[in-house]
Amino acid sequence: MRLTEALLAHAATLRYEDLSAQAIDATRVFVMDSLAVGMSGTGPQLPLAQVVRDAAFALGEGTSARAWVTGERLPATGAAMLNGYLVHGQEFDCVHMPAVVHPMAVILPALVAAAEARANQEQAPVDGRTLITAVNVAVDVATLLGISARAPMRFFRPAMCGALGAAAGIARLYDADASTLHRAVSLAYCQLPGTMQAHVEGSPALAMQVAMASRAAVTSWELARRGFPPPMDVLEGRFGYLPLYEGEYDTGPALAALAAREPQLLQVSHKMFPTGGAAHAGQDMLMELRDREGLRIADIESIELQAPPLVHRLVARPWKEDMAPSYARLCLPYLLATVMLDGRVGLDAYGAERLSDPRRADLAGRVRVVPNGSEDPNALAPQSMTVTTRDGRILQVARDAVIGSPARPLTRGQQLDKFNHCLDHAALPFDAQRRQSLLTTLDRLEALADVRDLVDLLIIEPT
């Protein structure tokens, strides 16, 4: 069986009862994480969110779904687009490192918008178990396509694989038959957004590609359910996703994972910092050296990071004057300088004063990223770091796994620290009672009667 047929069969037949306790727990955790990250995107540190919000309203009126935090009513397509931008706009959303896919950024906004729309338009509320199942379907489709790639990315895989997965997830949310689900995925393929050019330039359009992918998934479902006929061999056909967009691919590992019924949410990593994931290990190592050795920024002569080629491709870009926050989030030299001055990189690390700080620029110019011999085009580990001090010391540290990954998972306390850090940066204040209510609901997501009740907790009504 090809991966195409295996994935579609999996998406059409997976049931809540098939999921392990570990998969259900991981779903709760990453729904919590992704919602919190999206809520933080409403804050002033992501000003372009207002542009996306205005565009969503200009593209059409509707009341079937809502914007997170601020609560404006929108068509499901508009809500998916806006909330998708909020989730990915600060590089703080979770990532499936083997696939190099940020699955939840596209998937969760699309599924939540579709769930609200189904309840509002058809009086058919979507419960927590259905949402959990649909999220797992979507993440499995997105990431199993991603792990099949064998060449460096040319197209923005998080948006593309995310759209394909989200379309399958929405179809599962509606309990669609196998034929309709297939049409939804195929129609999503017809709308795939995103190249790596936005990443190379550090453009905020990178997150917009995720937003458009989330919108495309909802659009695909609405066409599919009405019977619109798409091309069907869109994953492995002559001009299907894998041969056209990825070029080199091997579906063997994905087929093996499906045969073993391995939930891909168990392979998803938290983002510990609001930066590119390829920069996480470097920040983590420098934080250790800073604390262990009592280092100050003035003590450092140079920093050398030994890393796989993907790290160099994604985050070894130079510091430059007047860089945008979207560029700085992917600029490892700037991020390491911020670690030395602030202790860690948080959501407030990208203000104009910090971006123009000459001390950061000075250290950034003395950071090098060099190959470590890895030939895996998708690997982010292992990595090692050598810091040379002005008094001649050579300090070294290494990581076999990235912080937040399944091999080095965040503790519950660290997860809650991130949750609260995100809500602290939302556009409207979330008091302790609202935060606890939201956490209680998320911790019992499988007991949720209606996804709209969860969205209610994401919104602060104006006083």
Where are these regions (language model features)?
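Active-site nucleophile and cofactor-binding loops and adjacent substrate-binding regions
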Residues: 99-105, 130-135, 151-163, 206-212, ...
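Amphipathic alpha-helical interface segments
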Residues: 104-109, 157-173, 183-253
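Terminal-appendage/accessory-domain detector
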Residues: 1-100, 205-215, 222-463
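Well-ordered alpha-helical scaffold segments within catalytic/enzyme domains
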Residues: 39-41, 111-120, 167-173, 220-223, ...
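Short, charged, amphipathic alpha-helices and their helix-cap/turn boundaries
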Residues: 72-91, 130-145, 180-191, 244
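Hydrophobic alpha-helical hairpins/lids featuring a short glycine-rich hinge
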Residues: 86-145
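Structural helix-adjacent loops and short alpha-helical linkers that scaffold large soluble proteins
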Residues: 118-132, 175-182, 229-233
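Membrane-interface helix caps and helix-loop-helix hairpins in membrane proteins
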Residues: 148-153, 200-201
